[in-house]
């Protein structure tokens, strides 16, 4: 019990036992020598209450950090995981195309005919396929024409599907801000809110001039059917406007057998509305990956 007064609170204290007191003091001196810096370069920085440690350079750095953490960790946990059945969907489409002597495709939002295009391979592989490709933007439409100019089976049209024939503004990323978005050319929608959301993914507080509007020609469903006949497959990629286009298709008079559209940009309410409308019309609806939905007639035997 005599060692209680040897060392307390980091300093030697007088003790009735001289040996313990001396050894304790020696121990403290040795530890102090170990922790003592050997040179000025190895000096241990001391915390000063008046100094603040800055982890981020500015508010933009804070936003980027929070955004990255949210997207990478929180959102995947909240979303319902959908297995990727893209290969099954591709084989299903090929099987249906092969089983018919003629097959007609309508693609809404064809862009340049190559980028993320599910129709391109079908046209190249099967000679009995004919396609009508709608693309309202001037530059992608020009690329579409160059791609299919020597194929009489393909009809590119510079127009967008809408409720009536005429024109309306299409919102795109402005040319002055296109270098800030890696896929600026593919972000075009009748919904300005969708383009704003797409800009915020790569821009910090995009200004109003980051979004521009382009006047485009529109065509309705009835005009397309009267001119080109019934379509077997309709592929929709309208950047957030897919739900409205699903409701523009006349499912009572000459309905298509297969409809493929993007659900990733739709609200949950719009997803339910599209699925309910298609099921009431006799379609089987399947989300075959995290971005796309396939709706097909029951007799076609859609993969479950």
Predicted segment positions?
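Intrinsically disordered, glycine-rich low-complexity segments
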Residues: 1-6
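Phosphate/nucleotide-binding beta-alpha loop and adjacent structural elements of enzyme active sites
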Residues: 11, 15, 26-304
């Amino acid at each position: 019990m005599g060692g209680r007064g040897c060392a307390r609170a980091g300093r030697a204290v007088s003790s009735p036992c001289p040996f313990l007191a001396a050894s304790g003091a020696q121990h403290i001196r040795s530890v102090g020598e170990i922790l003592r810096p050997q040179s000025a370069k190895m000096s241990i920085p001391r915390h000063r209450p008046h100094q603040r440690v800055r982890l981020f350079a500015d508010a933009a750095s804070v936003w980027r950090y929070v955004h990255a953490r949210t997207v990478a960790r929180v959102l995947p946990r909240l979303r319902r995981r959908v297995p990727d059945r893209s290969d099954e969907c591709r084989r299903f489409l090929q099987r249906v195309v092969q089983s018919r002597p003629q097959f007609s495709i309508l693609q809404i939002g064809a862009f340049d005919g190559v980028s993320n295009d599910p129709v391109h391979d079908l046209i190249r592989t099967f000679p009995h396929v004919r396609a009508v490709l709608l693309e309202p933007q001037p530059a992608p439409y020009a690329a579409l024409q160059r791609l299919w100019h020597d194929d009489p089976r393909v009809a590119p049209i510079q127009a967008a599907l809408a409720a009536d024939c005429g024109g309306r503004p299409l919102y795109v990323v402005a040319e002055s801000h296109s270098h800030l978005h890696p896929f600026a050319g593919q972000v075009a929608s009748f919904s300005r809110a969708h383009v704003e959301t797409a800009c915020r993914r790569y821009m910090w507080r995009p200004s109003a001039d980051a979004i521009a509007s382009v006047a485009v020609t529109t065509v309705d469903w009835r005009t397309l059917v009267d001119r080109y006949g019934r379509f077997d497959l309709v592929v929709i990629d309208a950047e957030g406007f897919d739900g409205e286009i699903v409701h523009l298709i006349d499912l009572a008079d000459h309905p298509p057998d297969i409809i493929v559209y993007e659900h990733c940009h739709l609200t949950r309410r719009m997803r339910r509305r599209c699925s309910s409308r298609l099921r009431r019309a006799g379609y089987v609806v399947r989300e075959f990956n995290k971005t796309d939905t396939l709706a097909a007639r029951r007799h076609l035997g859609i993969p479950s």
